[in-house]
Regions:
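C-terminal catalytic lobe of FAD-dependent flavoproteins
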Residues: 2-57, 63-180
Length: 180
């Protein structure tokens, strides 16, 4: 929603390149891996089979998605891609779509570079920027790095509001590399 909110200020150049990621869920008995398995797909991407309790999760896809939807669809092509990629590496699993217990998908708000490169080629690093009116925004990043992203936003807010006081924010690990 970063581009939508920033667009409320008027002239705003989109910074995001949206990517849809899909996961499939199987009963662990259908894909009884003991540890996370990294698989290379036919198009040189990487997907994972992750065991957790009675389930094994397979994912994720990484495809351009033109708009930000709260519940992005899981397409038949997504399912076929993940199933065929997994069967290529683990043919003994014999996974089929009728064995899927659940699916989910989400949107990655990657920071685009204007080059038109595929989403799989874009950096997952977050960026923090400030609009002319002072709106602080963050885009990109990974869910697993949410604490580091939050720290950058808090530090940027803190330093911007206390220009004269250069004390570090309590608990902060960094003093440099801030968004100003």
């Amino acid at each position: 929603w970063v581009d939508e909110v920033c667009g409320l200020e008027g002239d705003h150049q989109s910074r995001l390149a949206l990517s849809r990621g899909v996961h499939l869920v199987f009963d662990h008995a259908d894909l009884p891996v003991r540890n996370t398995v990294v698989m290379r797909t036919h198009d040189s991407r990487r997907i994972f089979a992750v065991p957790l309790g009675q389930y094994t999760y397979i994912g994720t896809t990484d495809d351009y998605h033109p708009e930000c939807e709260y519940w992005p669809p899981v397409t038949e092509q997504d399912v076929d891609y993940l199933l065929s990629s997994t069967r290529r590496v683990m043919p003994e699993a014999n996974l089929t779509a009728d064995r899927i217990v659940s699916v989910w998908s989400g949107i990655r708000p990657l920071v685009g570079d204007g080059s038109g490169r595929a989403s799989k080629e874009l950096s997952r690093k977050e960026e923090v920027w400030t609009s002319p009116s002072g709106l602080l925004s963050v885009g990109g990043g990974k869910l697993s790095a949410y604490r580091a992203m939050a720290e950058r936003v808090v530090e940027a807010t803190y330093y911007r509001s206390l220009v004269a006081d250069r004390n570090r924010l309590a608990g902060s690990r960094r003093a440099s590399g801030l968004c100003r």
